[in-house]
């Protein structure tokens, strides 16, 4: 007899109810809880999954390259990137009538296609690809890379090739390897690609497999490098009149510090980007030699942490500092994952911001729908990564934290004064919430009653001052870079002339620091409310994960438990998992405000109508009417009794997203008993219905647990929310700008 699922838990495999299936899925990735799991086996399994992850990323890139080459219009787009719409892939759908076929036969295609809003065309073009053949070659290369990664993952699970636990616990060697080899070398290698391939292509000089060994990336060759005369590589940069992809206006510089944007592409200068990656690479290679391994040179992280404690007799006694942290972190995968997720979350949000404020890909700044899609995509990813960071921080406290090993150090002291931390976050959230909502509601009421001049409009003077210090001239603050005769401004003009043009939007619409006013002030504080409330829930979940005054023994119940039975009142909804669950709702709420703000402000700029945002964003009805309702109008006319247009698929997705979202509430509002009764009734009916009763099942059907129903509800709420806004965002932007 075959082993029943899940093979990793014999206890679950013998469960006679459908609980076996759902708990099996829920715990499939909780390797720590699996039968016969040792610490060494755990590390080896995780190590192998990294290669699987890399393979999936490689296949994703390969698939995109392949479909763009096969079904896209890359070569036509390269010839005229501002007027040709890039094609993602062909659509074949048996449901399409002639009207839909005509509507989706777009962008010069001969059959229905989807338009690409991923920015991949801009990326491929910027890094030096210009033909379909190159896309196919790239696709095959990524496929081979994925196969290699899958093989590596399999290999490292074989007995002879499994790394030992000691190898995984060698933090210094791993850090050096990641810093110097993975970050450092790959950054320098990328500089090499930019200098040898992308920059020549941008100047009309093709570099391919056929000629890359005999095309000099710089006329002076390596001479200046070996003689220390590096400035030669920055001389003779591209001119302001350079035509991207041609020799017209091109220079010979390969590593520059021009600042600002290429006037035609409105993207950062490729030679600036190459310089940036070279500098980053060199710094990381140096950083990768900092930590002491078996060579006996460099710093010991353990010694650094042990030394980081306050001098004895310090007023207020600051405790044992960082003592004990080395082993605490090195022995806890959840702690390490929490740190990694938090770092990646911040970086992803930064990517969202930088991709529009300082675009690095040629012409992407003019593809407004792509800009909106990429910003929204990266901010959504950032909130999930941040929520995950706190979730694993809480699991660390429950499963891995050792009070003895961390006596009186910074971790222990965080737990000891958690009430102060949580209550301060609570106070900040309440303050932001009441004041921001108060201002919005006041403004809404006075506008409704016909006296808009009575609105309370606060100029964000401090933020404007910061913008002025960075060179924004519009506000008239005579400070730092905005002080035209000052030392800072003169130095900036000498060293990075393009910066002031970029910051003040001199050329084109690419404005680094957008002008801000009372509408921005209000929505900034609404977003701050969302961020602080999300943080409050997440921080409270982690700090209370081991126990609280209400439930001192909470850690004994694990990460996710519904309640401690009926006899102990008030223990529902207080597991660390519940905090994560509640925080995701707030995180989604917040990212909604962030993306609404970004999108509306940019729609107003792109349409040349900034007054609409400035005047309507100071009261609630302005947001509902002039952002949400006004921008839904084209979308919901994607199909009607008179036919359909190329927004029809987004209009349908908009409705479908609402449906998925609303389904979530069915799981969130009705609890387990309701479903159990319903299931028992359905089973009764099934067994008494001819033909149907010929089909039975081995597992007794039972309702989902409370925690499972919540996660199913949360998943529907989240996915529906994302589908709805994605359809709205893409349709409302592409409907206006083509």
Swiss-Prot record:
Coarse class of the primary localization is membrane
Query: What are the EC numbers?
Result: 1.97.1.12
Cofactor binding note: PSI electron transfer chain: 5 chlorophyll a, 1 chlorophyll a', 2 phylloquinones and 3 4Fe-4S clusters. PSI core antenna: 90 chlorophyll a, 22 carotenoids, 3 phospholipids and 1 galactolipid. P700 is a chlorophyll a/chlorophyll a' dimer, A0 is one or more chlorophyll a, A1 is one or both phylloquinones and FX is a shared 4Fe-4S iron-sulfur center.
What top-level class of enzyme does the UniProt entry assign?
A: oxidoreductase
Report if keyword ATP-binding is assigned: no
SUPFAM superfamilies per UniProt: Photosystem I subunits PsaA/PsaB
Where does this polypeptide localize?
Answer: Cellular thylakoid membrane
Q: Which domain of life is it from?
A: Bacteria
Q: Which Pfam families match?
A: PsaA_PsaB
Q: Which keywords belong to this entry? A: 4Fe-4S, Chlorophyll, Chromophore, Electron transport, Iron, Iron-sulfur, Magnesium, Membrane, Metal-binding, Oxidoreductase, Photosynthesis, Photosystem I, Thylakoid, Transmembrane, Transmembrane helix, Transport
Q: Which GO terms describe its molecular function?
A: 4 iron, 4 sulfur cluster binding; chlorophyll binding; electron transfer activity; magnesium ion binding; oxidoreductase activity
Per the record, the similarity remark reads: Belongs to the PsaA/PsaB family.
Q: What's its job? A: PsaA and PsaB bind P700, the primary electron donor of photosystem I (PSI), as well as the electron acceptors A0, A1 and FX. PSI is a plastocyanin/cytochrome c6-ferredoxin oxidoreductase, converting photonic excitation into a charge separation, which transfers an electron from the donor P700 chlorophyll pair to the spectroscopically characterized acceptors A0, A1, FX, FA and FB in turn. Oxidized P700 is reduced on the lumenal side of the thylakoid membrane by plastocyanin or cytochrome c6.
Protein name, entry field: Photosystem I P700 chlorophyll a apoprotein A2
Q: Source organism lineage?
A: Bacteria, Bacillati, Cyanobacteriota, Cyanophyceae, Synechococcales
């Amino acid at each position: 007899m075959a082993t029943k699922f899940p093979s990793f838990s014999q206890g679950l495999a013998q469960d006679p109810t459908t609980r076996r299936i759902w708990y099996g899925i829920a715990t499939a990735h909780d390797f720590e809880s699996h039968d016969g799991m040792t610490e060494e086996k755990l590390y080896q399994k995780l190590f192998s999954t990294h290669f699987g992850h890399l393979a999936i990323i490689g296949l994703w890139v390969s698939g995109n390259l392949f479909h763009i080459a096969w079904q896209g219009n890359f070569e036509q787009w390269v010839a005229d990137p501002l007027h040709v719409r890039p094609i993602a892939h062909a659509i074949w759908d048996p449901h399409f009538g002639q009207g839909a076929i005509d509507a989706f036969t777009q962008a010069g295609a001969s059959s229905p296609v989807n338009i690409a809003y991923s920015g991949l065309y801009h990326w491929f073009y910027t890094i030096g690809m210009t033909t379909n053949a190159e896309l196919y070659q790239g696709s095959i290369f990524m496929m081979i890379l994925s196969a290699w990664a899958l093989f590596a993952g399999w290999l490292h699970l074989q007995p002879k090739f499994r790394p030992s636990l000691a190898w995984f616990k060698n933090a210094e060697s791993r850090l050096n390897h990641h810093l110097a080899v993975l970050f450092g070398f790959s950054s320098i290698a990328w500089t090499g690609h930019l200098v040898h391939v992308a920059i020549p292509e941008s100047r009309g000089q093709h570099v391919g497999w056929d000629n890359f060994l005999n095309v000099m990336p710089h006329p002076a060759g390596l001479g200046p490098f070996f003689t220390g005369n590096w400035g030669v590589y920055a001389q003779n940069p591209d001119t302001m009149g350079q035509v991207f992809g041609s020799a017209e206006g091109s220079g010979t510089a390969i590593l520059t510090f021009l600042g600002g944007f290429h006037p035609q592409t409105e993207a950062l200068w490729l030679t600036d980007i190459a310089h940036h990656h070279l500098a980053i690479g060199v710094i990381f290679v140096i950083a990768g030699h900092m930590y002491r391994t078996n060579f006996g040179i460099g710093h010991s992280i353990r010694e650094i942490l042990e030394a980081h404690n306050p001098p004895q007799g310090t007023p207020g006694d600051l405790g044992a500092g960082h003592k004990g942290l080395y082993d605490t972190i090195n022995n806890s995968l959840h702690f390490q994952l929490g740190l990694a997720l938090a770092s990646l979350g911040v970086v992803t949000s930064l990517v969202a911001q930088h991709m529009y404020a300082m675009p690095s890909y040629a012409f992407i700044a003019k593809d407004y729908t792509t800009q909106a899609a990429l910003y929204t995509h990266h901010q959504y990813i950032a909130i999930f990564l941040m929520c995950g960071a706190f979730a694993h921080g809480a699991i660390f406290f429950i499963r891995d934290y050792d009070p003895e090993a961390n006596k009186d150090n910074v971790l222990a002291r965080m737990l000891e004064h958690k009430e102060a931390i949580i209550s301060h976050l609570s106070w900040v959230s309440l303050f932001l919430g009441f004041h921001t909502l108060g201002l919005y509601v006041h403004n809404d009421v006075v506008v409704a009653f016909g006296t808009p001049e009575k609105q309370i409009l606060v100029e964000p003077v401090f933020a404007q001052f910061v913008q002025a210090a960075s060179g924004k001239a519009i506000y008239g603050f005579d400070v730092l870079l905005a002080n035209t005769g000052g030392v800072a401004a003169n130095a900036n003009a000498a060293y990075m002339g393009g910066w002031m043009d970029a910051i003040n939007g001199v050329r084109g619409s690419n404005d680094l620091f957008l002008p801000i006013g009372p509408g921005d002030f209000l929505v900034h504080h609404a977003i701050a409310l969302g961020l602080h409330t999300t943080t409050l829930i997440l921080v409270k979940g982690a700090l209370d994960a081991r126990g609280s005054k209400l439930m001192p023994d909470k850690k004994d119940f694990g990460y996710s438990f519904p309640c401690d039975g009926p006899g102990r009142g008030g223990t529902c909804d207080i597991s660390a998992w519940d905090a994560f669950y509640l925080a995701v709702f707030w995180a989604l709420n917040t990212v909604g405000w962030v993306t609404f703000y970004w999108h509306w402000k940019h729609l107003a700029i792109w349409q040349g109508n900034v007054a609409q945002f400035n005047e309507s964003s100071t009261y609630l009805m302005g947001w509902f009417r002039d952002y949400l309702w006004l921008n839904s109008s084209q979308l919901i006319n994607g199909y009607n009794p008179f036919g359909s247009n190329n927004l029809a698929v987004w209009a349908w997705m908009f409705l479908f997203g609402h449906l998925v979202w609303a389904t979530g509430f069915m799981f969130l509002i009705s609890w387990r008993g309701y479903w159990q009764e319903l299931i028992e009734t359905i089973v009764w009916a099934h067994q008494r219905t001819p033909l149907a009763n010929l089909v039975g099942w081995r597992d007794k059907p039972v309702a989902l647990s409370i925690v499972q129903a919540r996660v199913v509800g949360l998943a529907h709420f989240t996915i529906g929310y994302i589908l709805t806004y994605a359809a709205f965002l893409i349709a409302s932007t592409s409907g206006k700008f083509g």
